[in-house]
Amino acid sequence: MLPEAVKTYIHTHRQEAVDTLSKLIGFPSVATPQPQDSFPYGKPAAEALDFMLEQLSALGMTCTNYDYHMGAADWDDTLPPHLGILCHLDVVPAVQANWTSDPFTAEIRNDRIYGRGAIDDKGPAVAVLYALRAIKAAGISLRKNVRFLLGCNEENGSTDLAYYLAHAAMPPQVFTPDGSYPIIHLEKGMLRLEFTKQTADPIVRFSAGTAPNAVPADASVSLSAAFCGTAEQGSQITCQGNKLAYKGVAAHASTPESGDNAITGLLTYLGSDAAFADCKALAQLFPHGCTDGSGLGIACADTESGALTCICSMLHVENGMLTGCVDIRFPVCTTKEAVLEQVQAAFAAKGFRCEARIQSDPHHTPKDTPFVQDLLAVYEEQTGTKGECIAIGGGTYVHDIAGGVAFGMEYPDWDYHMHGDDEFLPLEQLEENTCMMAAAILRICGE
């Protein structure tokens, strides 16, 4: 059980933690694509890192700044790091006009703190900070060293993590509170592919998809000839002369079954006209409503990681050049090499060229490792509910860290508007998560 002195400190310093999080939200730390002001991810991200390292240094921890890519704070630098806790201080952009309040000025409403980064991932970083403060204030010694890692580019490719790994080793046990409870222990592998072909289909322009990792909600096409297809138009398709459009439903590439792919819907309609041979071929490779890769011959599944998912996420035709994007999330029962070989063969058979742009192996930390079992025990102790490992199609900050897992801070069945408008974190959950982080540190590194 969490010592009373630790719980009391966390409870009595709750407002202080809220104030710290408010200050941290105040840094508009959207990582810049290019270095700015001599900082790799821009000045606001650097200022956010400086702010957190100042807090940790004042706590007596030994801090290292890895050239503003990542910061590290060691509890006891005379010992090798045993537990790594990985958070990030960069955030995704916010459209201020869509928010009820300024996304970079924290606001308390309805016992929640609103602001960009409240749940992803500044709130978790503050929870870890105050967990460490509570342990220190309670006079508790740790027999193993904790290294608190704070990155500045998780949202844009995790180059911060790559930079750190080029200069220092990762602790043998690592978790990130940049995911969901109870524990994310398995993340599917990913392939992102581009396919191309010079098409003879009578298309002036085809436009669909703006993100490679999302089911597109809209697709439109301008034709150079009258459409003579036999397919039923359906309510999703609108026609204005030689212009057609399909209205679908957006979804993340890791959960495509919750969407309605506008690309495949429009391809199926166009493919009913014999003049649109390439559209018909693509409709066969990506049957509308199919998300398991059957059309490409790659459907597979296993009990632990679930089924493969596959979407055509972007498709554009301009001056006769057809270019598209495919996002595939595959389970641990197959390999990226096997999937890529089959996909390229399927495209080649239809006359398309296909090349891989991103390749990532699955990430899997076995459920029965002592580290995972320790964290599950902490979750059960703190929440009173059964802890289970979960698998996801997306990726977390520890995807490329052997043995790493995501542990919090999102509770099941909560929508925190992460990456959306009015992102928030309930104040009560900030306190609960601080207790969770403290309990995890003490179980793994305590006496």
Tell what function each PLM region has:
Residues A94-I108, M190-R192, T196-K197, T238-Y246, ...:
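Acidic-glycine-rich active-site phosphate/pyrophosphate-binding loop
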Residues E155, L161-P331:
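Midchain, well-structured core segments that form catalytic/ion-binding scaffolds
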